[in-house]
Every structure is written in structure tokens, then in C-alpha cells.
């Protein structure tokens, strides 16, 4: 599910060079304008069916060349799920509060994925070209994930295809799209990241930010003990979401079987979610005042940040890992992203905004090491002619997307997929690979 500020809808963000005034201390209500719609649920885009190239005419005596399909032709990786795999926030490399151009790596067409490159196939799926699906090296990528998707398709204001076989006037579910795509491609690996929106994580973050902005340091109102938040993490709800994820994974297996694949011809990779913020002690802005949100875009009390890492994230990822076991397939692997951004998270000590670390832009030497890999939680900065979307909040930005791609390439393992946990290589001195990605390490599963 995706929520947004009550500002005029835009078919795509406009690239405008603008200088924002320093955040002045105003009545609290000013800071709350639009912040009730912080969205984490983010982005998948359906793709138009690709025409299979017809080989040149052969002598009449030659056997016809086989068309690409199960086990035949160029290998493909397909990604399914929600915003954490679709490419949401993949436009922005770090952040600046003074000039958006300093962090604008992909520009206003960042999420254009239709055949002509002129717009989105599904509005607000936000499938960026920096998304992890495109590992290269002779492997083709197809991104069917959608920002805001849950395990089941939603046909509300914005169509959000789930991992099911839905087909209607609004579009198709991701499992149906996978089945159709796999019939004419040699799909060797399907990567799934889903479940966060089933846990209502967007509304959880919304509650945490609102509680931070509306309570004083001497009487902190925490979100982790709000009944609306706690309800998402009861044993009953965790079991329910785990069951839904199992159903989604079963749908993936059914789609591949219907397309003509045996389990030995492809691998299912279940991908967990990364921690987007450090514990409270690792946040570089004080709890006092509004700087933590107005400057850093990370308006959480320390205890809520600690809870997010000690309880919320492990619970969500545990449900995914449990579902991977429950589905009972012999071709399942796991990519654990829990600590993939540690040291580069939003508001974390050791990294900062471009103006804080003294770098001109994302193209500056060392930018990948000194700036954040997770996008700010945005509120009033999305109003008017802003190039930002609320739904980009708290998602892997350009560096984060490329880091996950580097991890996934290691999982692909030259066509022999393996499981693993991903972390930053050379933490504190992160560097780019020759392909322009952060160098990551795939270690054993924790």
C-alpha cells in the first residue's frame, strides 16, 4: 500500500534545480504538514511482453533453431516483490538539503520503464534502472516488482500487483506476469522480497515519526508500544503474514511450472530486508529539538530506533525465512540483507549530507563512502515543485540499490546460485568496483 501527501499528483518528478531555505524553527504544526503520509511501501513495474527475435533463414535441410524458453537461450534473472527490490529511491545518491541536483544520479526519468522509455508501465511502481535485477555479465534482467505491493494484488487508487495470478482491467499480478515472461525466456533465477507491506510497515514508520514530532524530550511518546503498531507484531499476525508469504512463493513455483520448468532448471531466492537506520546511539543528530527530522530526515526516538532493529526487523525477516522453509522446495536459496547497509544507514555516524561531509556532488571521489545509502524520510520537502516523492522515504538510494545488485551477482555465482548474508566490503573505506557498484561481501548465512 502506498500513501502520499495531499499535494497535486505528478506523473513523474520534475528535475528542477532549487535551493531550499534553512529549516527555521516554526510552530510544530508547520513540521507536521504532510508528514502523516510517510510511505515505505514502494514500487514494482509491469513490463510489456518482449518479442522473441526470429533467427535468420536457414538452409532447408537444417533443423529449426529452438526459441528461448525453459532451459534454452540467454539466462535471465527476474525480481518480484515490493519497493525494497523494485528500485524505489534509486534516483538519489545520498542527500543534500541545499540542492537536490547534488544527489540526483538518474534524473527525472529514473523510474521510466515502458518500452519507449517515456514513462512508467504502472504508475508509482518506481522501477529504477539502478535496481538489483540487472546483474549483467551475460545475464538479462527483468524487474516485475512494484513499490507498495503486498502478497495479494490491490486495485485501489494506484494498482499494485501482488505475487498472484490476478488479471483484470487494471493489470496483472506478478505471478501471472512471471509465467508469461518465463515461457519465452530462459529464467534461471527468481528473486522475491515481499511481506513488509503486509506488516503495515509504512504505517508503523508514520506513527514513529509523528510521535517524535509531537512529543517533548521530557515526555517522549514512543511508537513501539502504540496498540496500532504492536498489533502488527503479535504472534497471530506474524503467523498470518508468514502464511501469506508462503502462498506468494507457492505462486512463483506454480508460475514456473506452468511455463514449463522443472525445479532443477531454476532457483528461487528469498531476499530479506536491510536495516535502514542505526540504533539510537548511532544516530548523529540529537534527540532534542527537530533537527533529527528537519535536517537528517530520521525523526525517531532512540528507543524506537533500537526497537526497529531488535524486534521489528528480525520479526519481519524471520517470517520471510520461515516461509522459505515452509514452502518445501528443493531449489530455494536465501539472500540475507539485514546488515547490508550497516555503517551507511540513514543518519548514521560516519556518513552525512553532501554539505556535512564537504563534497560537491554524488560524482565526487569518495561520495560512496561518505554519504548515506538510505533515503531520507521526507515530509514537507515533497511539497510544491519538489522533485522528491514521499514514497521514496527510508528506501535504498542509488548506492544502496547498486550494493544490493553486487550482492545478488554473488548469489548468482556464475549460474550456480548460493545463499549468503551481505555486508559492506572495506567498511569505513568503501570503494566502487570497476562496474561502478559498492564492493560488497557475501558471507555465510547468520
Task: Spell out what each predicted region is.
Residues 2-64:
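Secretory targeting and sorting signals
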Residues 63-79, 171-190, 246-267:
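Short amphipathic alpha-helices and their capping/turn segments at secondary-structure boundaries
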Residues 70-71, 87-93, 153-157, 201-206, ...:
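Short, solvent-exposed loop/turn and secondary-structure capping segments
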Residues 75-92, 100-104, 197-199, 398:
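Catalytic nucleophile-elbow at a beta strand-turn-alpha helix junction centered on a G-D-S/GDSL motif
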Residues 83-87, 146-152, 196-201, 274-278, ...:
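Solvent-exposed loop/turn segments at secondary-structure junctions
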Residues 99-240:
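Conserved SGNH/GDSL esterase-like catalytic core that processes O-acyl groups on lipids
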Residues 130-141, 241-268, 304-336:
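A structural motif corresponding to the C-terminal end of an alpha-helix
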Residues 275-395:
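Mobile gating loops/cap/lid regions near enzyme active sites that modulate substrate access
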